[in-house]
Each structure stands twice: as C-alpha cells, then as structure tokens.
Regions:
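A motif-centric signal for short, conserved binding hotspots located
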Residues: 1-225
Length: 225
C-alpha cells in the first residue's frame, strides 16, 4: 500500500516529457562524486542524482525574491557545481567547483542542474537535444534569466538591465534584484502535482500556461518591445 501522505512521484514519469528515471537503468554508480559517470553515453537520472535519501527534508525553495535561486530542503545532502567564467560572452565555463549542499542559505538550485546540464558533464559535446546551460547563463552574455544572479548583476548587459515593469508578471516584479530557480519554469504542467522537474506534458519539462517557446501561442516570436 502507498505510504500515507507520500507524494505520487511515479505518476509524473508517465507524462510525455521527463527525466529518464524509469527508462535508463544500470548506469548509475554509487557513489557518484564527480563527472566521470555523467557524460555522453552515460546519461541517466536516478532519484539519488538529485536527492539524498538520508539527509533530504520536507520543503521546496521559496519562489522569487533575492533568494529565489537557493535550494529547498528536499535537496539537502546532494551536490552540484559552481561554474567560473572568463570575460567572454557566450562560451562555457572555464572551471567548476563542487558544492555539497549542507544548508539552504549558501547553495543554489542551478548548481545541481549544472552538474548534468553543462560542459562539466559532457565537455564540449552536448548530447542530442541538450544545451550547455553554462553557456546560456554566462554572466557576460547580453542577457540571461536571473538564475545565477539578479539582472542588475548581469555583467554583459547594458542599461537598463532588467525588463520593464510592463514586461513582467507577479511574482517576478522585483526587477533587477530577484532571482529564480530552474524549477520555476521546468516542472509539471499540473499545478497540483508534486513539485520538481520530474515530468510534464509540455515539451522541455515546462509548467503552467506559458508553454510556448520560442514562439507564442500564435506561432510568432515573442516581442519584448
């Protein structure tokens, strides 16, 4: 019988788009302490790759605000990597520093994602259908989602760095200072489902009603003017 009060995570893996937790087996090694088992030909996603069953606690991250990219208690005990870049836009990180999540005040959710979704895992050759998030979140790019830091800290951006007030919706109104987590956009398409990047009916594991990218519902590219 199901454990009383437990989240039905398994149901999310029946959705069209999901991490390959049930479809790739026999690849994970315990323990995985670095990138040697994360690259092309070794791609996998076990529960343990994101959660430490001995240290995880109840509680997801707080959405929006200046601490919107901090991990939630569900990620305690896991590890990720912090990228370091040079001064050139649109290139991947030059190095990565391992981060072990011992608290919820000094570690960021993107660090967990970067350990598999960046050149840390696959060097200069991303797997088919995967992009290097260390390139896309490079602080010297002209723009980026405020995953690593608030937009006022996007070094390569020009003034005004944040979007205009008319271009954002709640809770993303603290323009320039607030940060966000990967799972703020990549989550189940059903709001009542358990939180996290487990599975979605929308491509690229997107959540909510704004599931159109790079075009809007009419098939037209977005215009921020």
């Amino acid at each position: 019988p199901a454990l009383s009060g437990a989240k039905n995570i398994k149901s999310l893996y029946a959705k069209a788009y999901k991490h390959p937790t049930e479809t790739v087996t026999g690849v994970h090694k315990d323990p995985e302490q670095d990138a040697t088992n994360l690259g092309v030909g070794k791609r996998h996603s076990e529960c343990w790759d994101c959660h430490n069953p001995h240290q995880a606690q109840t509680g997801s991250h707080t959405v929006a605000g200046t601490g919107g990219n901090l991990i939630g208690k569900v990620l305690l005990g896991q590890w990720g990597v912090e990228p370091s870049w040079g001064t050139t836009a649109w290139v991947t990180a030059s190095s990565y520093l391992k981060q072990v999540f011992t608290n919820t005040t000094g570690f960021k959710q993107y660090q967990l994602c970067m350990k598999c979704h960046s050149s840390y895992a696959f060097a200069s050759t991303p797997p088919t259908g995967i992009t290097d998030q260390a390139i896309e979140l490079n602080p010297y790019n002209r723009g980026a989602h405020p995953v690593r830091a608030g937009l006022n800290s996007q070094t390569g951006s020009t003034t005004p760095k944040p979007l205009a007030a008319t271009q954002v919706s709640a809770p993303w109104t603290a323009r320039g200072t607030q940060t966000m987590s990967c799972s703020d956009c990549h989550d189940s398409d059903v709001a009542s489902d358990p939180k996290g990047t487990h599975g979605s009916a929308a491509a690229r594991l997107k959540k909510g009603t704004g599931i159109y990218w790079p075009t809007n519902a009419s098939g037209v590219l977005y215009n921020l003017g």
